[in-house]
């Protein structure tokens, strides 16, 4: 028996290796570096890893898509795929991860009130215990979050590029497990944070079971877990369509959990509310990109032969997601829960682009993900800066109740104005990136014959504008309630990381709304999947 040595295309793996290598190096830094230098070293390493990954992705794009001599293909013995959609998803993830790490690194200006990061000084301590109190007084800083974030980003880079379903599952676990931990590390409201972590873990395990069951059925149908071979089996196999449809529905359901689509959205409001706010922004933006990248590959590569069987399922999920997300967002009184249900509604709008089943649908989904992700990270970055101040003048938890945002436009007009920009983008108001994202997604759906979904999407967008405008009215045209002993609202001064992140995301929201053509043209090249 002759053993054939597998050929590994190291250049194609460069973005993933950069991020995972930096994550491993971050673990070694935690073990051996002096405590005083860990934070600056970890922040620098994480930012360089995200920037380096984006540079490697840009290089691979030039080689594979830009005519540099390469071609879209499967790599690492078919375990991964290097094609336009995979590189587009990876590039967006790298951009959002860089901005998200900037927000995670924020700890307030030294000596100013609230000059602490968002993470518990000792994650393993019992909330309110003497151990936690001693860790807080000692000024301990949880720098393990940076390698955890990088491990999650590494899984996200693999997820949309997976060439077989086992690689897809492993990538799902690699991106999810760090997020389960990070969700329970909030410095403030520790019990709520730990509850969010437990709910996310339990429901995530349930979704993983659905995904695995779907993989098992698809393997039984095709005799392979390779996505390309399953596609080939759909063209040749007859008499087993029931097995294929059930397997696809279960597999897609597992992916829809990560997207936050109805009825797989139950974790979203609780986790978004309880997790550290910077992690919420990172998770809401980056996880969505990775999950939609994988969903597009499954729907466009495996499911085309079963379009008439799968499309009704996706249509129902899209309608429910848009309607339920919008209606429940309207009745929320907590800012983070409002943005959580807004995220659910946006998942529905993105699904409208997915069901277009056309190249324009693919490029529109990626543009929407970029626009939504940038605005989301910026919005949660500002939520983390708006805090409560008690009667003694101590700055405490985030001012997450909507009533606490009343009059913010007078106290901090810059913060309120930029936050209003993000809200207008979420609402799809012209001259913002959110408008262009919705427009191209809905246009692709109309061309694909899904005009009823577009009608529902337009009506849901109009209804969603109510709660976005309500927050803007609160900030600029409502006086804050003054109750004796009630905490006031203040905006903590940024150390600089959040200021840079907000400046980048706000500028991108405007530029992509006014001049989206270069990005749309670039993404139009990333619409062909390798089978």
Swiss-Prot record:
GO terms for cellular component: plasma membrane. Pfam families: Proton_antipo_M. The chain crosses the membrane at residues 13-33, 45-65, 85-105, 150-170, 200-220, 242-262, 289-309, 310-330, 339-359, 365-385, 415-435, 460-480, 496-516. One of its GO terms (biological process) is ATP synthesis coupled electron transport. It is found in: Cell membrane. InterPro entries: NADH-Q_OxRdtase_suN/2, ND/Mrp_TM. It is an enzyme of class 7 (translocase). It is a multi-pass membrane protein. GO terms for molecular function: NADH dehydrogenase (ubiquinone) activity; NADH:ubiquinone reductase (non-electrogenic) activity; quinone binding. It comes from the Bacteria. It catalyses: a quinone + NADH + 5 H(+)(in) = a quinol + NAD(+) + 4 H(+)(out). Its EC number is 7.1.1.-. Its main location: membrane. Keywords: Cell membrane, Membrane, NAD, Quinone, Translocase, Transmembrane, Transmembrane helix, Transport. NDH-1 shuttles electrons from NADH, via FMN and iron-sulfur (Fe-S) centers, to quinones in the respiratory chain. The immediate electron acceptor for the enzyme in this species is believed to be a menaquinone. Couples the redox reaction to proton translocation (for every two electrons transferred, four hydrogen ions are translocated across the cytoplasmic membrane), and thus conserves the redox energy in a proton gradient. Belongs to the complex I subunit 2 family. NDH-1 is composed of 14 different subunits. Subunits NuoA, H, J, K, L, M, N constitute the membrane sector of the complex. HAMAP family: NDH1_NuoN_1 (MF_00445). This is NADH-quinone oxidoreductase subunit N. It comes from Beutenbergia cavernae (strain ATCC BAA-8 / DSM 12333 / CCUG 43141 / JCM 11478 / NBRC 16432 / NCIMB 13614 / HKI 0122). The lineage of its organism: Bacteria, Bacillati, Actinomycetota, Actinomycetes, Micrococcales. The gene is nuoN.
